[in-house]
């Protein structure tokens, strides 16, 4: 006799037992109860054909189902633990830098997906650094909390923030938003730098030197900035 035939019968017996307990609590509707009665007759016929006791088969079916559920629970638990252990928060900005109010002389605002990009177009010929606080999971940017653009003097001149009304964004969304902000700031001949932490997680591909690859114009700006610092 095929072992799959027996184990299938055992599982069917246990599942019928669960459905019967459900019906005993007067929770089943008419179609449910009708199927229950028909399945009971079917199980009795199969038990006779297989020469298997229904009560014994029900207990064996319970063990099979419990093993399956235990395995699924263990795998789900392992994935949950792995996710929690892999989740971490990275902070370029202090609490003061995150909470500080700022004003724009020539405000420009753009919405890209679920992210809002704001910048001051009055800023010219400045060296600007982008800093961000965000969460990372499995070495990928998961959620942007806040990104701000600072001048060397510490003034805030740009910002990217999630829109509360449109929750959820990907690392690609953040990358695109950063590109928009950089492009807007560079338009007025500002030199834009990106924090090392943000570079690592906002751009996943790397150049030959192991640094995250940036758009060509951004590469030129960063090269000039590096030369001036040496």
Swiss-Prot record:
A motif (Nuclear export signal) lies at residues 137-146. A motif (Nuclear localization signal) lies at residues 34-38. GO terms for biological process: symbiont-mediated suppression of host cytoplasmic pattern recognition receptor signaling pathway via inhibition of RIG-I activity; symbiont-mediated suppression of host gene expression; symbiont-mediated suppression of host mRNA processing; symbiont-mediated suppression of host PKR/eIFalpha signaling; symbiont-mediated suppression of host type I interferon-mediated signaling pathway. It is found in: Host nucleus; Host cytoplasm. GO terms for molecular function: protein serine/threonine kinase inhibitor activity; RNA binding. SUPFAM superfamilies: Ns1 effector domain-like, S15/NS1 RNA-binding domain. Residues 1-73 are annotated as: RNA-binding and homodimerization. It holds the Pfam family Flu_NS1. Upon interferon induction, ISGylated via host HERC5; this results in the impairment of NS1 interaction with RNA targets due to its inability to form homodimers and to interact with host EIF2AK2/PKR. Residues 205-230 are annotated as: Disordered. Residues 180-215 are annotated as: CPSF4-binding. InterPro entries: NS1 (IPR004208), NS1A (IPR000256), NS1A_effect_dom-like_sf (IPR038064), uS15_NS1_RNA-bd_sf (IPR009068). GO terms for cellular component: host cell cytoplasm; host cell nucleus. Homodimer. Interacts with host TRIM25 (via coiled coil); this interaction specifically inhibits TRIM25 multimerization and TRIM25-mediated RIGI CARD ubiquitination. Interacts with human EIF2AK2/PKR, CPSF4, IVNS1ABP and PABPN1. Inhibits post-transcriptional processing of cellular pre-mRNA, by binding and inhibiting two cellular proteins that are required for the 3'-end processing of cellular pre-mRNAs: the 30 kDa cleavage and polyadenylation specificity factor/CPSF4 and the poly(A)-binding protein 2/PABPN1. In turn, unprocessed 3' end pre-mRNAs accumulate in the host nucleus and are no longer exported to the cytoplasm. Cellular protein synthesis is thereby shut off very early after virus infection. The dsRNA-binding region is required for suppression of RNA silencing. This is Non-structural protein 1. The lineage of its organism: Viruses, Riboviria, Orthornavirae, Negarnaviricota, Polyploviricotina. The gene is NS.
């Amino acid at each position: 006799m095929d072992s799959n035939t027996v184990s299938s019968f055992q599982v069917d017996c246990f599942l019928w037992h669960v459905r019967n307990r459900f019906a005993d609590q007067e929770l089943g509707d008419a179609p449910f109860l009708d199927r229950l009665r028909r399945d009971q007759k079917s199980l009795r016929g199969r038990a006779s054909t297989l020469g298997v006791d229904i009560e014994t088969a029900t207990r064996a079916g319970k063990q099979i189902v419990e093993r399956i559920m235990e395995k699924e629970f263990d795998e789900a638990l392992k994935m949950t633990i792995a996710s929690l252990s892999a989740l971490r928060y990275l902070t370029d900005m202090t609490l003061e830098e995150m909470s500080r109010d700022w004003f724009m002389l020539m405000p420009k605002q753009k919405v890209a997906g679920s992210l809002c990009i704001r910048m001051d177009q009055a800023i010219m010929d400045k060296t600007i650094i982008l800093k961000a606080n965000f969460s990372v999971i499995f070495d990928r940017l998961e959620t942007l909390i806040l990104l701000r653009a600072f001048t060397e003097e510490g003034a805030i001149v740009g910002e990217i923030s999630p829109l509360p009304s449109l929750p959820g964004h990907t690392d690609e969304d953040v990358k695109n938003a950063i590109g928009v902000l950089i492009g807007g700031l560079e338009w007025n001949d500002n030199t834009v730098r990106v924090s090392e932490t943000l570079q690592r997680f906002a751009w996943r591909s790397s150049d030959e030197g192991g640094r995250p690859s940036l758009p060509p114009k951004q590469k030129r700006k960063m090269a000039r900035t590096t030369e001036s610092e040496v």
